[in-house]
Amino acid sequence: MGYIRGKVRVIIYEAESNYKVGVLKVKETNDKGLEEFLGKSLHFTGYFGTLQVGDNYEMEGNLIYKEKYGYQYNVTDYKKMEVTGYEAVIEFLTSDLIKGCGEATAKRIVDTLGNDAIKKIKEDKSILMTVPKMSEKKALKIYSSIMSNSSVDDDLIKLKEMGFSINEALNIINKFQKNALSIAKTNPYALKEIIDFKKLDNIYLSGENPDETLRVKNCVLETIRLLEIRNGDTYFYLEEIRDGLKTYFNIVDVDYLEEVINSLESNKDIYREEKRIYLNSTYSMEVEIAKKLNYINSLPITGKNISMIDTEIEKLEEKLGVTYDTEQKTAIKRSLENRISIITGGPGTGKTTIIKAITSLYMKMYNLSPSNVNSYIALLAPTGRASKRLSEATNLGASTIHKYLKWNKDMNEFQVDEFNQNYQRLIIIDEVSMIDTNLMYHLLLGLTNTIQIILVGDKDQLPSVGCGLVLKDLIDSDLFNFCPLETIHRQSENSYIPYLAKEIKNKDITSDFLSKKDDYNFLRVDNSKVLESISRVCELSIKRGHTDKDIQVLAPIYKGINGIDNLNNHLRDLFNPKSDKKREIKIGDITFRVGDKVLQLVNDPERGIYNGDIGYIDSIVSVNNTKTLNVNIDFDGNLVSLTTGEMINVRLAYAISIHKAQGSEFVNVIMPVCSSYYKMLYNKLIYTGVSRAKKSLMLVGTVEAFLMGVNNNYSMDRKTSLKDQLLKYI
């Protein structure tokens, strides 16, 4: 049967059934009909067990063509290709380390000089001239590159033979220097901070005489980490870990698991508290958060006469032409009087109004001016869009937490820490429900003990993506000044959205939710008609002069007919139809087009773009008149140029997930509510989606699905210890 051989470049999609979609760079084939793909990337689909990015595979199957996706290779059988010395040397010669050596040249070198070609070239550079089609200029360039990397090339090739890519091998050598190869051979799990754990596990299992106990120990730690990501808990019980080992690593019937846990505890890798089992790092973070917050909260506010606040609030009301109600005045005053305060409320309750009042009063009390205010006050939020809203509301500078802490993407660490702290006096953090244990810990490390902290958020929104329930635990501890806002202050008397959000939160939906309002409508259609109905609504909006900047579709899941991916494919052709004047580029399974609305998926502080930022593709351009293309994206005035590799972290944004929308607001929101979403349609998710709408909200789907979701408490419970630690370290 025909086959293709090559390196897996990326896994685009992976289902629980082990069905995968990926991209293979084709290096070899025995099928003449596939020779046109040699040296090119080809999409493949099929059912796979373990499939590692960067590894080489032989795949059997047949080429198919789909109008929507183009050519794909439908895989019926596959096997991993063992890395030989021959292939490892070629990989090294064709890497970015060696100048002037393409794949054809590399093969001729190894075919002529053998697997020890590098050694021979280092001993006698003239030997390169025995290679067919070799020029003196090219030989000198290759020799110079080899010699400049002579200290690492042997280890690079040996690490490549073990299964690491050249880039991975370089990272290992840079981190562990002369011990790199020894560590990789004896305990590759020590590389887990820089290399994917599953790849390390496969490399260890394929080595000589793997130690089962060493593997189980490391798999236990990785299982707990994966459970933290999946469940959001900060601790687990033994049976949960046992089940996780089976799920993630097919490790079953470990009769000595208790001994492994005890050993990991002795090594301070995990922490046990009765039946609770934590990663030691997570446990320590909860403890340190509790200690620091309690210490800060114990310090008095000094330097100003607090009794003057009431008078200053009255002056501010007169200046701004507003009247704060009792609830708002209490929140403003108490936040200025206490070291740590928590202000929570749903949409329309005036959280932003209160932040503006607090910053204005603080500047007045401490005689601050716009020129020096940033030295005294820091306004922060978890996302770029939320920090921008904060800045617009207060007319002051605001920042993401990652930018404030000077996060280094390459090193994956914050430059601001306990040894290099920021020295503002007041810090106000919005959208606190999005902050997980890890981020809160690092934020507090970067703050002095004399800081004044005001935490603002909506306790009924989705919890953080990372583990923990920081906001809820702080409130439940009853140790800090807590100001809940219940009264809705929405400018329009006919505004229904905040009232609907409140009904969803309280699970007390009235029949009024079926009636059309000035800012709300429930379009009742069957699941099979949801996509068509949303498309029709958007078509009508376009005819009325609206653009994709005015409308945001929010959905809970990516796959399926009513999932985000399918919604994006349909909506893009409405808002940004194909045109000969609009250049396109296909990356993975997504075709990007000039003018497309796109979403950034990861933080990139050096470029000033962050997870959740929305931008528009400005242009797709050739780099230095080559075939290499870059994509220029305008993120609200910040024009960023991304390589095709970096575009893996970008998605179409005509429809986005409700999780990604958290921390943002949109003028008009359309939200499908389908029974096909099943468990992923739950109370906090619906509440969060509804509360993203500023001017209008349209729900599209069935009443049954909506009510089912409102009454579904999925995701509300997480096992955390921050509250316990707060009470312990008062």
List where the protein language model places each region.
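Conserved helicase motor core of SF1/SF2 NTP-dependent helicases
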Residues: 342, 353, 357, 361, ...
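N-terminal pre-P-loop "Q-motif" helix
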Residues: 321-337
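Interdomain "pre-motor" coupling segment immediately N-terminal to P-loop NTPase/helicase cores
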Residues: 66-68, 246-307
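Short aromatic-glycine-enriched beta-strand elements
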Residues: 13-26, 624-632
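C-terminal accessory regions
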Residues: 613-624, 628-730
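Long, highly charged, low-complexity intrinsically disordered interaction regions
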Residues: 15, 24-215
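Structural detector for short beta-strands of small beta-barrel domains
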Residues: 1-16, 61, 617-618
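Conserved helicase motor core of P-loop NTPases
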Residues: 351, 370, 460-599, 604-607
